């Protein structure tokens, strides 16, 4: 998940403040672990599932924010690509019929996703790698979810790398971008 940001331009002082906050929060978390502040007696099981959105031809449907809004459920969130969304399932105590409860929850949430996608002209699919994604679907313009946090993440990764990212995926087919 993550939170949307409003700011789109950052100075060195912003990066310095971010680093300081990250270090302070990490230290705070270490302290909580050292104090055994977390309830270790009740184990919980949580899950998430990433989904792909396809059009009637099986190509990526780039309307994740529309589908998420149509669910009306905060357990659905966006992913980097406009043709992906994520279910963040409910947590359950790790006891008894926990797997049956997770399955029921997942079926219910998946059904919500299917109905919302259908209302938005898309279909929901579960793929590890979307089989019809090609190089044309990997350009930020047009296929990256239009949230500032994704745009800034992309900009920072490219800036840190100092050169374009090259992908070479080889399996039954080869994709080179």
Language model: regions and residue ranges:
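Phosphate/nucleotide-binding catalytic core
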Residues: 1-177
């Amino acid at each position: 998940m993550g939170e949307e940001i409003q700011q789109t331009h950052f100075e060195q002082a912003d990066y310095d403040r971010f680093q300081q906050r990250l270090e302070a929060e990490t230290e705070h978390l270490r302290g909580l672990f050292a104090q055994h502040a977390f309830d270790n007696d009740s184990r919980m099981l949580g899950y998430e599932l990433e989904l792909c959105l396809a059009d009637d031809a099986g190509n990526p449907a780039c309307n994740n924010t529309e589908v998420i809004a149509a669910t009306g459920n905060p357990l659905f969130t966006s992913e980097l690509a406009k043709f992906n969304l994520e279910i963040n399932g409910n947590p359950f105590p790790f006891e008894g019929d926990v797997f049956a409860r997770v399955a029921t929850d997942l079926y219910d949430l998946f059904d919500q996703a299917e109905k919302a996608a259908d209302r938005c002209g898309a279909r929901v699919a579960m793929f590890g790698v979307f089989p019809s994604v090609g190089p044309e679907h990997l350009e930020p313009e047009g296929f990256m979810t239009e949230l500032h946090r994704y745009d800034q993440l992309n900009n920072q990764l490219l800036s840190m790398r100092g050169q374009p990212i090259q992908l070479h995926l080889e399996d039954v087919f080869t994709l080179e971008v």
